[in-house]
């Protein structure tokens, strides 16, 4: 995917800004940040007023790029940074942007086949990180999320996220 002779994986992170480039205006050394997984060249219609996730230059940091988060220091674009939510731990802060971006891309990233109000969506693993984001995106978009869980004690959590219904997969012998 890239031509560098090395690869540092990892697409989700939170941390403290250690250094900034000369053109960076919004961030300074010492800022506590969350790093979003999207990188792009910033020079097309989708990056400038559209949806950068649909940019032809869009790539996932640490997966399609050589420099990811599994390092002591990570190199990112300034537009990848978000202020770290103070009510979340460092670990909690690090994990939500990747699963949110992944769920968003699954539901809205295949034009013209995108999620619309009234659509029914089966969300397998609805109580996990990716599934819980998918349920919330469905609810926010007016779609009907039906969550699939593996334990009955997860039902209420998924319903509180906005699911219209929940199926416990252990109540069924066959999904074929």
Give the ranges of each region predicted by the language model:
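Surface-exposed amphipathic alpha-helices with a cationic face
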Residues: 132-140
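Adenosine-nucleotide cofactor-binding segment
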Residues: 123, 139-176
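A glycine-rich, Thr/Ser-enriched phosphate-binding loop motif common to dinucleotide/cofactor-binding enzymes
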Residues: 64-70, 86-111, 124-127, 133
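A short glycine-rich beta-alpha junction/loop motif
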Residues: 73-81
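Glycine-rich beta-strand-centered segment in the early N-terminal region that forms part
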Residues: 1-48, 67, 80, 85-88
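Phosphate-coordination loops involved in phosphoryl transfer and adenosine-cofactor binding
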Residues: 117-119
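Phosphate-binding beta-alpha-beta segment of Rossmann-like dinucleotide-binding domains, i.e.
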Residues: 40-67, 114
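N-terminal Rossmann-fold NAD(P) dinucleotide-binding loop
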Residues: 10, 131-132
């Amino acid at each position: 995917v890239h031509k560098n002779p090395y690869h540092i994986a990892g697409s989700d992170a939170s941390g403290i800004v250690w250094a900034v480039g000369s053109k960076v205006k919004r961030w300074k050394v010492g800022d506590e940040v969350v790093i979003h997984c999207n990188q792009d060249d910033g020079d097309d219609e989708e990056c400038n007023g559209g949806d950068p996730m649909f940019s032809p230059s869009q790539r996932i940091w640490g997966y399609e790029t050589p420099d990811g988060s599994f390092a002591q220091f990570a190199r990112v674009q300034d537009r990848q940074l978000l202020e770290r939510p103070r009510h979340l731990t460092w670990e909690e802060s690090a994990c939500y942007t990747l699963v949110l971006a992944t769920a968003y891309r699954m539901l809205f990233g295949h034009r013209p086949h995108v999620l619309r109000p009234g659509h029914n969506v089966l969300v397998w693993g609805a109580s996990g990180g990716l599934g819980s984001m998918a349920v919330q995106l469905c609810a926010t978009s007016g779609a009907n999320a039906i969550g699939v869980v593996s334990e009955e004690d997860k039902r209420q959590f998924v319903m509180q996220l906005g699911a219209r219904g929940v199926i416990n997969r252990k109540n069924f012998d066959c999904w074929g």
